[in-house]
Amino acid sequence: MTKRRVVVGMSGGVDSSVTAWLLKEQGYDVVGLFMKNWEDDDDGEYCSTRQDWIDVVSVADLIGIDVEAVNFAAEYKDRVFAEFLREYSAGRTPNPDVLCNAEIKFKAFLDHAMSLDAEMIATGHYARVRERDGRFELLKAFDHTKDQSYFLHRLNQAQLSKTMFPLGEIPKTKVREIAAQIGLPNAKKKDSTGICFIGERPFRDFLNRYLPTKPGPMKTPDGKVIGEHIGLAFYTFGQRKGIGLGGSKDGSGEPWFVAAKDIASNTLYVVQGHDHPWLLSRQLVAGNVSWVAGEPPADGFSCGAKTRYRQADAACSFGRADGERFSLAFDDAQWAVTPGQSAVLYDGEICLGGGIIEFAATGQPGQTAPAPAAGHTGALAEAR
């Protein structure tokens, strides 16, 4: 009997290594595939590509599988990094891991795996896939503290139908135990936390290599200039550290937070206090939508939503605007909803999909909002 071939995306980390071992133990014909998606600075202190490949080869030798490397650097720069820079240049804060999953790990990688006669692909992501009534659902991982469905919400039916997530039902602590028990050479390797395939170098230093600094005024809501920023691209909504106001004696004495950007005047607005009205939003508009099932929820659908990773699902109602945009009205105000990030919708354990946040209505006067979806005429309409 011919074994089913599964190509596993192996990064050199513990999760993908245990994924490959589990599938081998289950009787699959496992092939490991290591993706090299970034060319620059491979000899620098922040890029671990060489060591990661060494770890992949060591793990493959231990568990007895074939492994190869494939270079997707051109695809990554064209499909992910170029968009990453465009978004930052426009004053937004993108999430490259979301786009990397949709365009590289589950598109370029999937296509290459199929050329190797694979029936399925597998990764070390913490999520689950369930087939029901001929459709494929993306579910949260059993270990909600490690759930990564937020980053996978742009996957479609074709991609999910070919994807396995063996770690979706296993706690992270158990994965570490398995790695130690079977003697994986990378069993104690720490999890990566940097931007997808760029590493853990200081982010501002990295971004400054590609985007020029453009200093401008830093103002309070009443228009008082209290400092100078180095460029709007280098700040994000809700940011507290690194804005250079730690010793400022102006205002109430509470911490300062980035609250708004005025691209036209190159002005960065900062506010004092975690719960300042300019940091709180009850409604948002998102575009560039993607739905796991191929269709959006019904207008007025009650669901949960995340506007950032590791956030608890926030109760809200969904409003359909048009084919490319939707609005969300939250039961409770959300903190630092950031344009460029993803708004991801959930029906309990099921990830429905989502879109890129374009606008969030806050207490800032004079906001210009896109037209709200039907039935969502409150804060968005008032902000217009």
Swiss-Prot record:
The active site is at residues 100, 196. Coiled coil: none annotated. Transmembrane segments: none annotated. It is an enzyme of class 2 (transferase). Its EC number is 2.8.1.13. Signal peptide: none annotated. CDD domains: MnmA_TRMU-like (cd01998). It comes from the Bacteria. GO terms for biological process: tRNA wobble position uridine thiolation. It catalyses: S-sulfanyl-L-cysteinyl-[protein] + uridine(34) in tRNA + AH2 + ATP = 2-thiouridine(34) in tRNA + L-cysteinyl-[protein] + A + AMP + diphosphate + H(+). ATP binds at residues 9-16, 35, 124. Belongs to the MnmA/TRMU family. Catalyzes the 2-thiolation of uridine at the wobble position (U34) of tRNA, leading to the formation of s(2)U34. NCBIfam families: PRK00143.1 (NF001138), trmU (TIGR00420). PANTHER family: MITOCHONDRIAL TRNA-SPECIFIC 2-THIOURIDYLASE 1 (PTHR11933:SF5), TRNA 5-METHYLAMINOMETHYL-2-THIOURIDYLATE -METHYLTRANSFERASE (PTHR11933). This is tRNA-specific 2-thiouridylase MnmA.
